[in-house]
A protein has these predicted regions:
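Long, hydrophobic alpha-helical transmembrane bundles and adjoining juxtamembrane helices/loops
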Residues: 2-394
Length: 394
């Protein structure tokens, strides 16, 4: 009996169709992911340029010689009893840098924007959190170094450096809708979540609280390299606490999500309380009026301050713009990373509702609480995608 030629051709035909379809799907995924990543370049580059203008262009345009009692940090340092010119390390270069930073924060904390600055420092942790979290993941990128990036944003301003940092995170994070090796898509294990919590408590919260309570220049100087303390405490925890056996449930990706989300809830609560205290301070201030609230005159000015602006007001202006640029960068970056973590594409209408909802949360509960909500949603999305991938591979 002679086999039917059509039956012989069927496997080949099916193989060809399956191959074409699979290649089409792969190419489509690559194009979509490349489009998502390419779109981030003009967005975060624009934020970087705007931050340079509103922060450094404004500050550099001020004539410090006309300001009363300008803080000075001579090179080499001349150690005196002045808070900024104390002997912090005994080394010329670090002491000169610390002189500038301590003077800056000492003047700013005694400026009219003191409440705004404290509010910003409480919200800041949620802004820089992905620099800690995304590197910690099993398949996280080693290029995302909070130690290095944190040093840069402490010296040059978080609002200037973070747009480039978020751009790096986005480009070093793959979409779960992609194929092949996926960077930055593994949910956190229990040990990783514990290390993040330790770095937050010992590297940021403890020095921040002591600095805010004492306002001691030595503590202000010690607080400046908090990205170092966060990186070092996390590394020490991971080195000293042994990894659980691979068969242990706590070693599986996603096992640390509950602890991580509990940490986020705590951070969002602290951020919300600080935000409400700040709003109370704003609404009860003698200068507050409803027209100024509705006309957004409470936002820092885009125009360059007058050349005879006192240092206290100039530093306050700098930190206000620093906060605005940090919040805008982190908000857009969080939405981008959330989209990369989702297995399904969100519609335009869905994004509009989500953005408006998150802005409402940010206004009511504070930027830190809003960002913690987004980081929690991203972790949930990664856990869902990881479980779906595991079921598919069974």
């Amino acid at each position: 009996m002679i086999p039917n030629p059509c039956l012989l051709a069927t496997p080949l035909w099916r193989y060809w169709v399956d191959s074409v379809i699979s290649q089409y799907i792969i190419i489509t995924i690559i194009i979509i992911n490349l489009t998502i990543h390419l779109a981030s370049i003009p967005v975060f580059t624009s934020l970087f340029l705007l931050a340079n203008f509103t922060l450094w262009t404004h500050i550099n345009a001020l004539d410090a010689s006309k300001a009363p009692d300008p803080p000075t940090c001579p090179s080499p340092p001349t150690y005196t009893s002045s808070p900024g010119e104390l002997r912090y390390t005994g080394l010329a270069v670090p002491d000169q840098i610390l002189c500038v930073l301590v003077n800056f924060f000492t003047v700013a904390l005694h400026s009219p924007a003191k409440a705004h600055i404290i509010h910003f420092l409480v919200q800041l942790l949620a802004v820089v959190l992905p620099l800690v979290v995304e590197r910690t993941r099993d398949n996280g990128s080693m290029l995302i170094s909070h130690f290095v990036i944190g040093t840069a944003y402490q010296l040059k301003g978080a609002g200037v450096v973070l747009p480039l940092a978020y751009l790096l995170i986005i480009w070093r994070t793959a979409s779960v809708r992609g194929s092949g090796t996926k960077r930055g898509t593994a949910p956190l294990t229990q040990r990783q979540a514990e290390s993040i919590l330790v770095s937050i408590l010992l590297g940021f919260v403890l020095p921040s609280v002591v600095t805010a309570v004492t306002l001691n220049p030595y503590w202000i100087a010690l607080w400046q390299p908090f990205p170092w303390w966060m990186s070092v405490t996390q590394a020490l925890y991971l080195l000293t606490v042994p990894s659980p056996p691979s068969s242990s449930p706590s070693s599986k990706p996603g096992s640390g999500s509950a602890l991580f989300k509990s940490t986020l809830y705590t951070l969002s609560t602290a951020a919300a309380i600080a935000h409400w205290v700040f709003l109370y301070h704003v609404f009860t201030a003698p200068s507050f009026s409803l027209p100024s609230l509705l006309t957004f005159s409470w936002l820092p000015s885009l125009s360059i301050p007058p050349r005879d602006t006192p240092h206290a007001d100039a530093f306050a202006h700098f930190l206000e713009w620093d906060a605005v640029m940090c919040y805008a960068t982190a908000f857009l970056g969080a939405l981008w990373l959330l989209d990369l973590a989702r297995t399904k594409t969100t519609s335009v209408g869905g994004w509009v509702k989500e953005v408006l909802g998150k802005i409402f949360v940010g206004v009511v509960a504070g930027p830190g609480a809003m960002l913690c909500t987004l980081w929690g949603e991203r972790e949930d999305a990664l856990v869902h995608a990881w479980k779906a991938e595991g079921e598919k591979n069974k």
